[in-house]
C-alpha cells in the first residue's frame, strides 16, 4: 500500500515533529511518502498535484490551511505568501474552500485513492484568540468540503481544541505573525540539539513548539488519525 501525505511544513517535518515518520514506524510494509512543502498554501498544492497523481497512491491525506489561515490574519503575511508562490489572487477563506474542493475533485477523478481531508492544527494555544478561532473556522470549511466531495474528514482541529479545553491552562506565549518563536525554536533544535518536546515544555506549550509547528503530542494526533484511515483501507 502506498500512502501520500500532502501538506506544508507541518507535514514536511523539518521544523516540526514528523508525523510522517511516526506513520512509517507504525505501518511496516506500507510505503508512506512525504509530500509536504514548507510555507505551502492550498493554491500551490493544487498546482503541484500532478506529483501526487503520478505516483498512483492508495491513500492520500491532505493537511493544508495553516498558511492560508495566517494570510487572512495580516497583510504582511499575505503579501509574503502571494509573492513566494506567485499567486494571481489574494488568499481568502473562499479561495481556500474552492482550492480544497478542486484538490479533492482532481484526486477523485485521476486516482483510485482513498482521500482524507484533515482540518488544520491550532495556531497558538489560547482558546479565546483570533488566531486559534480562525483555524477552527478553516476546519469547518474542510469539514464542509469533505462532505460535499464525499471524502473522509479527519477532525484534527477539534481534537486539539478539546485537548486544550481539558487541560484548562493559560498559555505563556501567544501566536503572532512577527514572533521569533519559530526561528528560535529551529535554532535550538538544529544548532543546540534540543528536542521539540523540550522546547515546547520550556515555553509552557502542550501541542506546539512555537504556536505553529508541533511537538510529538500534536504530531501524534495526526499520525493517529491517518493510521486509522490506512488500517481500515
Model-identified regions with their sequence ranges:
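Nucleotide donor/acceptor-binding cores
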Residues: 1, 30, 113
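Catalytic nucleophile-elbow at a beta strand-turn-alpha helix junction centered on a G-D-S/GDSL motif
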Residues: 1-16, 67-69
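A structural signal for the hydrophobic beta-strands that form the central parallel beta-sheet
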Residues: 5-6, 34, 117, 208
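Short histidine/acidic/glycine/proline-rich micro-motifs that form metal-
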Residues: 9-12, 36-40, 122-125
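Residues that form or flank phosphate/diphosphate-binding pockets in enzymes
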Residues: 14, 43-44
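Alpha-helical cap/lid subdomain in secreted, periplasmic
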Residues: 18, 22-26, 46-233
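A short beta-strand-loop structural module common to alpha/beta enzyme folds
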Residues: 29-43
Amino acid at each position: 500500500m502506498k500512502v501520500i501525505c500532502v501538506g506544508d511544513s507541518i507535514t514536511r517535518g523539518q521544523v516540526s515533529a514528523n508525523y510522517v515518520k511516526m506513520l512509517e514506524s507504525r505501518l511496516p510494509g506500507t510505503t508512506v511518502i512525504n509530500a509536504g512543502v514548507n510555507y505551502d498554501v492550498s493554491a500551490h498544492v493544487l498546482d503541484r498535484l500532478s506529483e501526487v497523481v503520478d505516483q498512483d497512491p492508495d491513500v492520500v491525506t491532505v493537511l493544508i490551511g495553516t498558511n492560508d489561515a495566517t494570510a487572512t490574519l495580516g497583510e504582511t503575511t499575505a503579501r509574503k505568501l502571494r509573492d513566494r508562490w506567485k499567486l494571481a489572487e489574494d488568499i481568502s477563506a473562499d479561495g481556500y474552500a474552492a482550492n480544497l474542493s478542486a484538490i479533492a475533485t482532481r484526486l477523485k477523478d485521476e486516482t483510485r485513492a482513498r482521500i482524507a481531508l484533515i482540518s488544520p492544527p491550532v495556531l497558538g494555544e489560547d482558546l479565546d484568540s483570533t488566531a486559534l478561532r480562525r483555524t477552527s473556522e478553516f476546519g469547518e470549511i474542510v469539514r464542509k468540503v469533505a462532505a460535499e466531495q464525499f471524502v473522509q474528514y479527519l477532525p484534527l482541529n477539534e481534537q486539539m481544541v478539546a485537548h486544550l479545553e481539558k487541560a484548562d491552562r493559560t498559555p505563556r506565549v501567544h501566536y503572532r505573525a512577527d514572533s521569533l518563536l519559530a526561528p528560535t525554536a529551529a535554532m535550538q533544535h538544529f544548532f543546540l540539539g534540543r528536542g521539540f518536546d523540550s522546547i515546547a515544555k520550556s515555553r509552557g506549550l502542550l501541542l506546539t513548539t512555537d504556536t505553529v509547528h508541533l511537538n510529538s503530542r500534536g504530531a501524534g494526533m495526526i499520525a493517529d488519525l491517518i493510521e486509522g484511515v490506512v488500517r481500515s483501507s
